[in-house]
Regions:
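Conserved, mostly hydrophobic/aromatic
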Residues: 24, 49, 53, 93, ...
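Catalytic domains of carbohydrate-active enzymes, especially glycoside hydrolases
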Residues: 43-65
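Non-globular sequence segments
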Residues: 91-94, 99, 105-121, 125
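Positively charged, low-complexity/disordered segments
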Residues: 126-130
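N-terminal amphipathic alpha-helix/helix-capping segment at the start of soluble metabolic enzymes
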Residues: 1-26, 93
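Glycine-rich, proline-tolerant flexible connector loops at the mouths of alpha/beta enzymes
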Residues: 58-83, 104-117
């Protein structure tokens, strides 16, 4: 038996069955619209990895709030209008018997000044009153 043979055997994470143990780590591609919509480029990128045999694909950072800036091209899950693109992404990955995992992200204090919509000092007095 090869040293790597287990890599190609089915695996499990909790109740989720995987066709193999090959996992694509989360990475930023910049292939989503600045408003968080999934673009065709991202669908094609993820499909190629699923088609190539990856068992589990992780998305790049996916913002949970529209008003918190992210790098251009990051996906969003903050509004129901984004669901159709997310559904397309899931369907494409599942079509190749792969699974997909969403990486939720909030920039917090790491948000750049250029993209930060709400400054923390604006809420300091609110917090101190509690």
């Amino acid at each position: 038996m090869s040293t790597l043979s287990k890599l190609f055997q089915p695996g499990r994470i909790g109740r989720m069955e995987l066709k193999n143990r090959i996992v694509m780590a989360a990475m930023g591609t910049g292939y989503c619209h600045h408003d968080g919509y999934v673009l065709d480029e991202y669908l094609a990128f993820m499909e190629e990895r699923a088609k190539g045999g990856t068992g589990l694909l992780m998305t790049g950072v996916t913002r949970i709030l529209s008003e918190v800036g992210m790098r251009p091209g990051s996906m969003g899950v903050y509004d129901d209008k984004l669901i159709p693109g997310l559904r397309d992404l899931t369907d494409i990955v599942h079509r190749h018997d792969a699974k997909i995992c969403l990486q939720l992200h909030h920039s917090g204090t790491r948000t750049s000044e250029e993209t930060r919509a709400v400054r923390s000092e604006e809420h300091t007095s609110e917090l101190q009153s509690h």
